[in-house]
Amino acid sequence: MIRKAQFKKSEIEKFRLEIARSIVAGKLQNCRSVLSRTARKSKNESEKQDIKEAIGKIEKNISLLEKAESIESIRGYEGASAKTYFSVFDYCIIQQKEDFQFHKRTRRPPRSRTNALLSFLYSLLTNDCIAVCQAVGLDPYIGFLHDERPGRPSLALDMMEEFRPFIDRLVFTLINRKQIQVSDFLEKPGSVFFINDDSRKELIKSYQERKKEEIFHPWLNIKSTVGELPYLQARIFARTLRGDLKYYIPFIWK
């Protein structure tokens, strides 16, 4: 039944628009939280000012989301915010700065060690989101923000957006605590970086440990773990599809 509702509502443009708006708003607010935390801890006044300016731009895009009349506009605000966010991403790296310099997000292939970390850990999050969609009866391939493509888990990609900043924080922790180092990577011609097999196993362990950490869910008003959040959000999404909730309520990181 829930998949029938999902398929039907994925064809309703107004419903898709509201879902996409909520998803992106949640992601951008969580990105803002990451940068706000960095700004509070930064001792470099120039960097702190750059971060505050980036936060201001993201906050402006959050407010513009409310007036967006198309999914394309929402994607535009998300894309602009992502560019702003990643423009100050390097300031969040305190240790091993030279070895883990970050200039911009590159995916296929990852052209820095930090990009390789992000891509690998995002892929673990994607797999978790596919699993929780299936667990609550949703079709992970029928999305609302992301268009459907053959073999693309569009709904899982939708669901993971608000959790990407959690991965970003984990990456900063691993680098700044020197739990990941240059020796964990292979560099190929063209400045293409890959994580070696043994280090991938260690990263999976770090990811699983992060998932065990307790966190408070403000809307549900319960204590949870980081790993349970995608499942809880998938259930909220299912309730939205059934009509129990008027809008999808993303997880906002306090």
Curated annotation (Swiss-Prot):
One of its GO terms (biological process) is maintenance of CRISPR repeat elements. Pfam families: Cas_Cas1. CRISPR (clustered regularly interspaced short palindromic repeat), is an adaptive immune system that provides protection against mobile genetic elements (viruses, transposable elements and conjugative plasmids). CRISPR clusters contain spacers, sequences complementary to antecedent mobile elements, and target invading nucleic acids. CRISPR clusters are transcribed and processed into CRISPR RNA (crRNA). Acts as a dsDNA endonuclease. Involved in the integration of spacer DNA into the CRISPR cassette. This is CRISPR-associated endonuclease Cas1. Its cofactor is Mg(2+); Mn(2+). The keyword Magnesium applies. One of its GO terms (molecular function) is endonuclease activity. Its EC number is 3.1.-.-. Mn(2+) binds at E78, H146, E161. Homodimer, forms a heterotetramer with a Cas2 homodimer. Keywords: Antiviral defense, DNA-binding, Endonuclease, Hydrolase, Magnesium, Manganese, Metal-binding, Nuclease. The keyword Transport does not apply. It comes from the Bacteria. Belongs to the CRISPR-associated endonuclease Cas1 family.
